[in-house]
Regions:
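A structural signal for multi-pass alpha-helical bundles of membrane permease subunits
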Residues: 30-310
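Short, Lys/Arg-rich, polar N-terminal cytosolic tail immediately upstream
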Residues: 1-26
């Protein structure tokens, strides 16, 4: 009998393990219940519209399946490539400008402004352009650049710099620069806020060690601060490229895509296909192609700038 008892497995620890599993199971169920509303919201506002767009892109106006006909029509339209070139030029102007200006301002404030009150004031001022509705921004920009009553021409002529009106919205290259300047004004503060927050995470010990070794400000930025900012550049690039592909409001108000099609960006082109030419299938195909392009671009940028420090 004593031998049989000695050979029985120890029972210690079994009940605590079962209790731990039950506790984890309850926590997992609670987590799932908390996530259900969020997942349901995402499903309603993201998944369902995407599925409907894909369905519309492969059907005609009567709902009959047409395969890839709408995609072929969209890719075969010369105006699509005009819009693609205009969007590419717009991106080449606004993205480098916003990143360089935002980075310069973030470094300037980080190194020269030490008073918390002044930093908070600059933070509030930087947030203001981001909360202004794009339509309001477009209307104000129209008052600045419009011929006849534009404020910019009035100031230039009053200062004697020009003696006749400049058609800021009537010349293709000037019109592109005008709509790009509005985007730069509104979104450079976003870049500044993100990069300034990133600069606050740089270990002070690394900077002090570099200063002791005689490193210049450029060396500190290149080998220390830039290392910590790399994931944030990925974040900025992805969000800004996605926003460039959908920018609409101020371009529609300022130029309407003109002169000609010089400022007709992809979003404005899709709007015209849908609401002017009433070709919902082609517009849906373009929307799906833009979404695929954003996904591919995100994958490429992720490979180039790994998020090991994000």
């Amino acid at each position: 009998m004593s031998r049989l008892v000695a050979e029985l497995p120890a029972q210690t620890g079994t009940k605590p393990e079962r209790a731990g599993r039950r506790r984890r199971s309850r926590e997992e169920r609670l987590a799932y219940r908390i996530l259900v509303p969020a997942l349901g919201t995402v499903f309603v506002i993201v998944t369902i519209p995407f599925v409907l767009a894909v369905w519309q892109s492969i059907t005609d106006e009567d709902g009959a399946l047409v395969g890839l006909r709408n995609y072929t029509k969209a890719l075969g339209n010369p105006l699509f490539y005009d819009a693609l070139r205009a969007t590419g030029l717009y991106a080449l102007i606004v993205l480098p400008s916003e990143i360089l200006l935002g980075l310069a301002f973030a470094l300037l404030v980080h190194r020269l402004v030490k008073r918390p009150a002044l930093r908070a004031t600059l933070y509030v001022l930087a947030v203001l352009p981001l909360v202004v509705p794009p339509v309001a921004v477009g209307v104000v920009a129209r008052l600045i650049y419009a011929p006849g009553y534009g404020v910019l021409n009035y100031l230039l002529q009053g200062a004697g710099i020009t003696h006749s009106e400049i058609l800021w919205l009537g010349v293709p290259i000037l019109a592109m620069g005008s709509i790009a300047s509005v985007d730069i004004w509104q979104w450079t503060p976003f870049v500044y806020l993100v990069l300034f927050a990133g600069l606050q995470t740089v270990p002070r010990e690394s900077i002090e060690a570099a200063q002791v070794d005689g490193a210049t400000w450029w060396t500190q930025f290149r080998y220390i601060e830039l290392y910590y900012l790399r994931p944030l550049f990925l974040l900025i690039l992805f969000f800004r490229v996605a926003d460039v592909l959908r920018v609409f409001d101020h371009v529609f108000i300022l130029t309407g895509g003109g002169p000609g099609t010089s400022t007709q960006l992809l979003s404005l082109y899709m709007y015209r296909i849908e609401f002017k030419f009433f070709d919902g299938g082609q517009a849906a195909a373009l929307a799906v192609l833009v979404l695929v392009a954003i996904s591919v671009l995100y994958s490429l940028v992720t490979r180039a700038l790994p998020l090991e420090r994000a």
